Amino acid sequence: VVAVKTSEFEPGDITAFYYNNKLLVRRVICTGGSQITVEKDGSVLIDEQPLDEPYLTEKSIGQCDLEFPYYVQPGNVFVMGDARAVSMDSRLTENGVIPTDRILGKVLFVN
């Protein structure tokens, strides 16, 4: 994984971070200070506006135990994997949102 260190993230950015000593690559869906809703069909709303996700081939609610709408606190990001049906990500309270200071950077390349 090649990543550029930064503290500024936007929806759509691909990030790398460690979770339980394992390197994970996930996409930022919602940044701190915003509210996210994931509908039953997998559609995502940020502050009640539909999120355009042209990178997805299939939408899915996947594994999720959060109640929506969910407010993302400043200094955190809500991440999801592109393989929504099977991704372990911020939709699970076990994983939760990711503090931006734990993110290694924006991913440029994955080998």
What are these model-predicted stretches?
Residues 109-111:
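Non-heme Fe(II)/2-oxoglutarate
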Residues 1-71:
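Feature for secretory/organellar precursors and membrane-associated catalytic proteins
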Residues 46, 63-107:
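Acidic/glycine-rich C-terminal interaction modules and beta/coil loop segments
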